[in-house]
Amino acid sequence: MANRTVKDAHSVHGTNPQYLVEKIIRTRIYESKYWKEECFGLTAELVVDKAMELKYVGGVYGGNIKPTPFLCLTLKMLQIQPEKDIIVEFIKNEDFKYVRTLGALYMRLTGTATDCYKYLEPLYNDYRKVKVQNRNGEFELMHVDEFIDQLLHEERVCDVILPRLQKRFVLEETEQLDPRVSALEEDMDDVESSEEEEDEDEKGRDPSPEHHRRNYRDLDRPRRSPSPRYRRSRSRSPRRRSRSPKRRSPSPPRRERHRSKSPRRHRSRSRERRHRSKSKSPGHHRSHRHRSHSKSPERSKKSHKKSRRGNE
């Protein structure tokens, strides 16, 4: 029959490879249209062409449990059991991300714990987005590294129960597996090595102590006169400007504000000052103008005598 496993197929985990998929899901796959039309008579070489046509990842969806093409091709690969080299090429394919995810799922189902860690962990560096169809038939976005993390740590992926996987630290203790080195650590090592090289270059460029002494001696010498270009940029002092009047453009003379020297204003100001100084003293209550007009008879006699003496 078309649904039987090939005769020369090896048992996987002590059982028929197709039995890794649950019976109810397996029967739904056999009854699906995609299985009957697209998966009939496929070989290991033709599976690659069908895998390149995949548009999303998923298990079963809907109320009547319809399988996705991704799950149908997974069961077909379990049935024909392609060689390990073909699966490794699936995983290493960088052009088609769904071909890579299909090979990763098949390796997780059929490979040993050492092979799973060896071939799947490098895919942690693949950050491309893939479409995933959930049980409700809706599409979600996921990254390839997330899908690989589910394969290595979860019990069920794409509605398929995954075989038990041995812990990584156990394989490291038995020296079956080397400690994992992440791509981030490699980048950090590259950055540190580049920084060390830059430090060495800077040390090589550092001048010797004799050069420092020369620089210190040079500080005592008189400074060189600035270049003509630097001279032009300097702003001239007012002395230099006064020395070179020819270069300056003749400007109109400035109008200075002269104080008015009229005798009337001068007299009025002097009178105001006297009035202020006398008003500050407590004994004087009369105004300056009243004192100037009202003179005593004694003062008038004295002034008259002085005028007569001057005439004589």
Curated annotation (Swiss-Prot):
Residues 184-201 have a biased composition (Acidic residues). InterPro entries: PRP38. GO terms for biological process: mRNA splicing, via spliceosome. Residues 1-179 are annotated as: N-terminal protein interaction domain. Keywords: mRNA processing, mRNA splicing, Nucleus, Spliceosome. Belongs to the PRP38 family. PANTHER family: PRE-MRNA-SPLICING FACTOR 38A-RELATED (PTHR23142). This is Pre-mRNA-splicing factor 38A. The lineage of its organism: Eukaryota, Metazoa, Chordata, Craniata, Vertebrata.
